[in-house]
Amino acid sequence: MADPVEDIIGDYRAFVAQQRDRLATRGIDITPYPLSHLAYRVPEWYQYVHVRGLLERHAIANPENVWNGRPMSLILLEQPLEVLGGAFVPLIELIPPVHQRVYKMGLEHLGVVVGDGVDEFSRVHRRSLTGQQFQNAHNEPYYVLFEDFTHVKFHRRSLREVVELQGARFDGFHHVEDWVPQRIVTATGPNPLPR
């Protein structure tokens, strides 16, 4: 059976399995935890708009908003993606061209919901973690950065819950209007990603 989301973002099952296996070699087992989201990055604005349109065909909501000076889509899928033999990913964070450093284009990170035990989790796994991001009062994930510039982020709350705490609603499709993209060179250069 065809998987239209896989056709758009690539083999997300293999990506999640790879991240799980990499974490296991570092002594971190993510199987007990729910999954928040997958992040997918594109190097050019026109690709962002195109991929957003394709993904929204398989979604029920996208409260797109501006974060760090550029639009960001939070695409709530009509059917969550099944991964790891029974875990589900309900949301795709679609991220336009980068704002500050080198990032992996395509499938870039997996969000894992550790819950209120996330600080204890960080103490237990301190040697395996790369750092912590301070995004806002509701979202300060710990993360592991791998050599290929992909990540796994460990959250107190799912990305959907964070966005709802900030006042957004997943009630249809809302896009940022009148935003003008900046020209930024990414780690993949000015050329599009290979297909």
Predicted regions and their residues:
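Glyoxalase I/VOC metalloenzyme domain signal
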Residues: 1-36, 40-69, 75-195
